[in-house]
Structure formats: C-alpha cells, structure tokens
Curated annotation (Swiss-Prot):
Protein name per the record: 2-epi-valiolone synthase
InterPro entries: Dehydroquinate_synthase, DHQ_synth_AroB, DHQ_synth_fam, DHQS/DOIS_N, DHQS_C
Gene3D superfamilies xref list: 3.40.50.1970, Dehydroquinate synthase-like - alpha domain
Record GO terms (molecular function): 3-dehydroquinate synthase activity; metal ion binding; nucleotide binding
An annotated GO cellular component: cytoplasm
Residues that bind NAD(+): 92-95, 124-128, 148-149, 161, 170, 188-191
Positions that bind Zn(2+): 203, 266, 283
Organism: Actinosynnema mirum (strain ATCC 29888 / DSM 43827 / JCM 3225 / NBRC 14064 / NCIMB 13271 / NRRL B-12336 / IMRU 3971 / 101)
C-alpha cells in the first residue's frame, strides 16, 4: 500500500501509566522534565524547585496576565527572585519578529543575565515566541514553559521547536531550543472557552492517528468529557499527548530527517493559516482541516483503510472541528491555498511532503503529492 516515493512508519504507543511527570531525553545536556499538575499551588511549587533559587522574568500575554500571572509573579517576588514581568498582546499576530525584538530590548533593559531564567506563561503564541527570544538573547538563556492552553500543553510547549511567523510562511524564523522544564497546570484549562479546547484536541487527534490507536479509542469514547474539559478524561489526555510527543521527538529532536509523522495535517494547515493572515483560524482548526485533506488524498490513492478514513473524519467532526473549507472561520479560496502550498514547497527544497495515514498508528511520508491531487481534495472538501 505504500507510495513509491515515501516510506511507512509504524507506532503503537500506549497510554502512560505515570500521571505526574514525563522525563524528556534529548541529549545529555538538554534533558528536562514535563510536570502535569492538578492545581496552581503544585505548579508554583514545581516552578520554584526547577528555578533552584535563580532569578527570573515572567513573560505572558494580556489575557493570561489577568487570569494566571499574578500568583506566579507574587511568589517569585516574595522570594526576591522576580526581575520583572511583561505581557505581549494576545493572538497569533504577536508571534512575529517585531514582538521578538521588543522582548529582547526589554530583557536588555532589565539586565537579564545568562544564568537567569525566562518563564513563558501562556498559550502557543507565548511559548513559541518566548522560546525563540530565549534562544537568541545572549546566544541562549534558560527558559521554562508554563503552558496555559490545551494546545500548548499537548503540543506547542513540548519539543523545543521555537519560532515566529513571517508573511511568507508560518514558523519561518526559529530555532531548536529545549526548555529547562515544562510545567502544565490542569487548573488553567478550566478558563478556556470551547473553541480553544477544540483547537487543542485537534493536536491530540493528530498524535493518536499517527502513533497511538489506544489514544484514538480513548478520545472516541470520551469525546463529550474532553469537550467539557472534565476530569479525569482531560488529565489522561494531557499526560498521554506529552508522553507520545516526547517519544516521537526524541528520535529526531533537531529534525535532521524532516519527514516526520508529527507534521500530519500541518502541510495544508500552515497554508490555511498563511492565507488567512494568522487571524481568524485557530492553529488547531487549520490542522484539523489539514488532516481531513491528507485523509482525502490518502483515500484517493487507495492508501488508507476506508474504515480508518471514516473514523478519523468522523472524530474530527464530532469534536466540532472543520472538515470543509466553508467551516473555517475565514473561507479561503482553493486557488489561494494551493498557491500557499506551492510557496511552502519552494521553501522546503522543492518537495511537497504530506503525511498520509494508512491505518491508526501507521503513516506514509509521501514526497510526490502533486498540485492536482491537493486541488482535487480541496474541491471535494469545499
């Protein structure tokens, strides 16, 4: 069933047994721990342990600042460890070089030293942007991710890929730079709206399709509880997603092999985000639609088991995520999405790589997907 221009990857990662922490092995110098904790008290305790007396700055956004930042900064200030705190404007448009340079200017103003720590408290935009800033300032200073959205806890805050967007493409300017620790507080998820929860669930569905049939079954069986962000379902999900991503990233932490199954849904998803100018479509929504496109291409090629194709699309729909162009927040034209994909191909050395599902836990990395195939899929999914 494999595409002649691709290779097949099998995975069957079980749900983790340890629901307190995940240890991440990258290299000898880059290992770190992911803490998944039920409440703010334990999250702050974990942060203080990881800081080990070092001073820190807190960078968040103007929404999270009102919800969660006060407690973190107050605890640091009480111990004489707070250098300063600042907030960027919430939203994808802040994930830019302009914001990054403004933050670097601020770090210089507060005299952040090489041994000091940068704390990224927020969603995907914050952890991506702040991680990039930490990688660049003084050739790299330590940072701790405290992701506050589901998407950041299950994906963006883990793995050490830090970047900002560019008008030409999403995540065009970035680095591989691992955090000192990741501290996820499940209590923070209670403040999210349903759309943000759905966006985060898209990234977990991605991991389930490519690497964990057991997790896919779990999401199907617990979809309503997950949408309600109810325990214990959401707790299991965050732990499982972190464990699965770290295992996959650990095999190729610096993307020496760019053909990775974690990019399932992201080829078209990034094109949609670029076309809609990083505004009305959330990242998880774009990835969800990108997965549906990949499933459609795989079905047209006769690669994917039909039952699996139906289950994946049905689960995405059940979670309230887009399965058609018209269901996106801003409806891009087929021609515009194709044009963005062709630009991505130019940036990525001429190959339009698609991760195509074969069955749950098995994917083909295809490097020969044509413009015509993608256009036909987009037309079918219009």
């Amino acid at each position: 069933m494999d595409s002649p221009a691709g290779y097949r990857i099998h995975d069957n990662i079980p749900l983790p047994g340890n629901l307190d922490q995940v240890d991440v092995h990258v290299t000898r110098d880059d290992d770190y721990r992911i803490h998944v904790l039920p409440d703010v008290d334990r999250a702050v305790d974990a942060l203080l342990t990881e800081l080990d007396g070092r001073r820190a700055v807190v960078i968040t956004d103007d929404v999270v600042a009102d919800l969660h930042e006060g407690r973190v900064s107050a605890e640091l200030a009480a111990r004489g460890q707070l250098i300063g705190r600042t907030a960027i404007r919430a939203g994808e448009k802040s994930k830019s070089l302009t914001t990054a340079f403004e933050l670097i200017d601020w770090l210089a103003e507060v005299n952040l030293a090489r041994r000091d720590v940068v704390i990224a408290l927020g969603g995907g935009v914050v952890v991506d942007t702040v991680g990039f800033v930490a990688s660049a300032y003084m050739r790299g200073v330590p940072y701790v991710n405290m992701p506050t959205t589901l998407l950041a806890q299950v994906d963006a805050g883990i793995g050490g890929k830090v970047a900002v967007d560019h008008s030409e493409a999403k995540n065009l300017v970035g680095a591989f730079y691992q955090p000192k620790a990741v501290i996820s507080c499940l209590e923070h998820l209670r403040t999210l709206d349903t759309r943000q929860i759905r966006s985060g669930l898209a990234e977990v569905v991605k991991k389930a399709v490519i690497a964990s049939p057991e997790l896919f079954d779990y999401i199907e069986a617990n979809a309503d509880d997950l949408l309600a962000c109810a325990s214990p379902a959401i707790d299991v999900l965050v732990h499982a997603a972190g464990a699965i991503k770290t295992k996959l990233v650990g095999r190729d932490p610096y993307e020496i092999d760019l053909r990775r199954p974690l990019n399932f849904g992201h080829t078209t998803g990034h094109a949609v985000e670029t076309v809609t100018n990083y505004g009305p479509v959330l990242h998880g929504e774009a990835v969800a639609f990108g997965m549906v496109v990949a499933v459609d291409v795989a079905r047209a090629r006769g690669l994917v088991v039909p039952e699996v194709a139906d289950r994946v699309t049905a689960l995405i729909r059940r979670l309230g995520l887009p399965v058609a162009l018209e269901e996106l927040g801003a409806v891009p034209r087929v021609d515009d999405v194709v044009a963005a994909l062709l630009k991505i191909r130019q940036i990525r050395d001429g190959s339009l790589r698609f991760v195509l599902p074969v069955e749950l836990g098995a994917t083909v990395i295809a490097e020969d997907v044509t413009e015509e195939e993608v256009r036909a899929a987009l037309v079918r999914l219009r």
